[in-house]
């Protein structure tokens, strides 16, 4: 089956008016019928709007690299998530994707580091989603601002993305997502958020 990627919302679009939220929920409702998996890229960091979006999601995929700053940012996000009273450990599946690594062993090592500190200091549990190797095709695709899967579909990084995508498709969504779909999940989240403000 062909894979299609659509850019729906970026980090600049997370500050939304009520009208924009309604439109976004309408779009999510349509996407529920079209897509098996919907990925929302919130960008790095733990700003309130990023954390709120993550809290509304049934699955969280933390993308990190071997760089110490990236690992620190990833742990900071996870710490903020686990310590937030709105976070439901039973409802949310958290996975780690090791990006731009030199080997499968390094990718697993990145996950092991995060998993150790999450277990030790947050009493949490995260799973390993896989790894994306650093290669020249990936570097070129980044410079050209094109998906490596389209730019160089036979490259190691593109094949790794296919493996990760297949795993995501085979993974079980949470009961909440299966029952209500993405639009109902986010609708409930924004309703709770607005009630908390009033």
Describe each PLM feature range:
Residues 1-33, 142-143:
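P-loop/Walker-type NTP enzyme "switch/lid" segment
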Residues 3, 121-149, 161:
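Beta-strand-loop-alpha "switch" segments that mediate conformational coupling across diverse proteins
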Residues 9-10, 97-99, 144-151:
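Short hinge/gating elements
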Residues 18-25, 68-75, 108-111, 158-162:
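Amphipathic alpha-helical transducer elements in NTP-driven molecular machines
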Residues 26-30, 80, 160-163, 167:
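Alpha-helical scaffold segments in soluble metabolic enzymes
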Residues 33, 37, 42-130:
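Conserved catalytic-core segment of NTP-binding enzymes
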Residues 117, 121, 135, 167, ...:
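Phosphate/oxyanion-binding loops and surfaces in catalytic or ligand/nucleic-acid-binding neighborhoods
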Residues 147-198:
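NTP-binding/hydrolysis catalytic cores, primarily Walker-type P-loop NTPases
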């Amino acid at each position: 089956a062909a894979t299609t990627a659509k850019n729906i919302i970026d980090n600049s679009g997370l500050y939304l008016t009520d009208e924009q939220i309604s439109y976004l929920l309408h779009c999510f409702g349509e996407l529920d019928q079209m897509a098996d998996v919907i990925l929302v890229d919130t960008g790095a960091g733990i700003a309130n709007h990023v954390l709120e979006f993550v809290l509304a999601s049934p699955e969280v995929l933390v993308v990190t690299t071997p760089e110490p700053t990236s690992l620190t940012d990833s742990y900071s996000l996870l710490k903020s998530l686990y310590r937030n009273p709105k976070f439901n450990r039973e409802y949310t599946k958290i996975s780690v994707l090791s990006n731009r690594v030199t080997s499968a062993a390094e990718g697993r090592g990145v996950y092991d580091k995060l998993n150790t500190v999450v277990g030790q200091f947050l009493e949490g549990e995260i799973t390993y989603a896989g790894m994306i190797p650093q290669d020249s095709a990936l570097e070129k695709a980044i410079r050209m601002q094109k998906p490596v899967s389209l730019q160089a579909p036979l490259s190691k990084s593109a094949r790794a993305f296919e493996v990760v995508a297949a795993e995501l498709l085979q993974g079980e969504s949470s009961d909440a997502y299966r029952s209500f779909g993405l639009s109902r999940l986010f609708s409930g989240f924004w309703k709770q958020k607005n009630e908390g403000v009033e």
